[in-house]
A protein has these predicted regions:
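Transmembrane alpha-helical segments
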Residues: 12-16, 65, 121-126, 148
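Membrane-interface anchor segments at the N-terminal boundary of transmembrane helices
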Residues: 1-9, 48-63
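N-terminal hydrophobic segments of proteins, predominantly signal-anchor/transmembrane helices
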Residues: 29-47, 56-120
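Membrane-interfacial helix-loop-helix modules of multi-pass inner-membrane proteins that assemble, modify
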Residues: 99-105, 151-172
Length: 172
């Protein structure tokens, strides 16, 4: 695997923390997720006993750490409500499925942890930082700007075939 993949993936958490230092927290969350989704490599690092380390998990871990460091009071503003119930069920579903299928508690808890990192953490961070119309407006504007930035890359790939991921990260 290309060394740039390791640099980008394991340097992402410090970058997100640095971003929180210089940009308002809400903007840092939005920028972190958009840049990660558009530009980080599609790769999974498997660590025994832990959820896979992907671009989304790296972003979530970075935002959680940055929130603990720079915006710890934000956690106290979160209140679990009825609208959060579907996500809670979605994150806990693998446990029931694993036990029902005879795979055991360990496999079920592992799947719950993976599901929570993949879906629950982004949801939770969105609820923490984007829980009002102003936050959603900023998110929509930044997604639009991210799309505009991505257009030249899409045009290049239309002409040259999907090559940018291979060029930068060494695989597709």
């Amino acid at each position: 695997m290309n060394p740039l993949v390791y640099i980008v993936m394991f340097g992402w958490i410090p970058f997100v923390i640095y971003l929180f230092r210089w940009v308002p927290a809400q903007r840092a969350v939005i920028i972190s997720f958009i840049i990660a989704w558009l530009f980080l490599p599609v790769v999974k690092f498997h660590f025994s006993g832990l959820p896979d380390y992907t671009k989304m998990s790296a972003t979530c871990y970075g935002i959680l750490l940055a929130t603990i460091i720079f915006d710890i009071k934000r956690f106290s503003s979160f209140q679990l409500g009825w609208l959060d119930l579907p996500m809670l069920v979605w994150c806990l579903c693998p446990l029931a499925s694993s036990i029902t299928n005879g795979l055991g508690l360990y496999d079920g808890l592992s799947a719950v942890l993976d599901q929570t990192v993949t879906w629950g953490l982004p949801y939770y961070l969105g609820r923490l930082y984007l829980n009002n119309l102003d936050g959603l407006r900023k998110l929509a504007i930044d997604i639009f700007i991210g799309g505009l930035i991505y257009i030249p890359l899409c045009l290049f790939e239309l002409r040259m075939s999907p090559q940018l991921h291979r060029i930068f990260y060494g695989f597709h």
